C-alpha cells in the first residue's frame, strides 16, 4: 500500500515539475474562483472552458473509474504533459499563465476530450 501511495505522489510531483516550466502550472490547491470541470459519465462535463490568463481550472473526478488530464503538445505546450490519475473525488488544478488554446484528453480514454481557451 505504501508503494502505491509513493508511486502516486511521485507521478503527481513529476507532472507538477513538467507543468511549472511553461505556460501551464500545476497547483496544489484550487485557487479561489477557479473554473471547475467535472469528470462524469466518461466525459469532461464542460468540454470547453474560457478563462483569463493567470486563472486556473480544477478537474474533479466524480466516477469510480480513474481518469486524468493529458495536455497534448502544441502551441504553448512544448511536450505532452500528463497529470496524475485521479480516483473518485480527487482533483487536479492547473493555472494557465499565457493566452492560447490548450487541448487535452484522458490518457486511458482518449475519446474523452476537452479544451481550455485562455484569453
Curated annotation (Swiss-Prot):
InterPro entries reported in the protein's UniProt record: Amicyanin, Amicyanin/Pseudoazurin, Amicyanin_Para/Methyl, BlueCu_1, BlueCu_1_BS, Cupredoxin, ET_Amicyanin
Localization (cell): Periplasm
Cofactor: Cu cation
Residues engaged in binding Cu cation: 67, 106, 109, 112
Pathway where this protein functions: One-carbon metabolism; methylamine degradation
One GO term describing the cellular component: periplasmic space
GO molecular function per UniProt: copper ion binding; electron transfer activity
One Pfam family linked to the record: Copper-bind
Function: Primary acceptor of electrons from methylamine dehydrogenase. Passes those electrons on either a soluble cytochrome c or to pseudoazurin.
Record's protein name: Amicyanin-alpha
Amino acid at each position: 500500500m505504501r508503494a502505491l501511495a509513493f508511486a502516486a505522489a511521485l507521478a503527481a510531483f513529476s507532472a507538477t515539475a513538467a507543468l511549472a516550466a511553461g505556460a501551464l502550472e500545476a497547483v496544489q490547491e484550487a485557487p479561489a474562483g477557479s473554473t471547475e470541470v467535472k469528470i462524469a459519465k466518461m466525459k469532461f462535463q464542460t468540454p470547453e472552458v474560457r478563462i483569463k490568463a493567470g486563472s486556473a481550472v480544477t478537474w474533479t473526478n466524480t466516477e469510480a473509474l480513474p481518469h486524468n488530464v493529458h495536455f497534448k503538445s502544441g502551441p504553448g505546450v512544448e511536450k505532452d504533459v500528463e497529470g496524475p490519475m485521479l480516483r473518485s473525488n480527487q482533483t487536479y488544478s492547473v493555472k494557465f499563465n499565457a493566452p492560447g488554446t490548450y487541448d487535452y484528453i484522458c490518457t486511458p480514454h482518449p475519446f474523452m476530450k476537452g479544451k481550455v481557451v485562455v484569453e
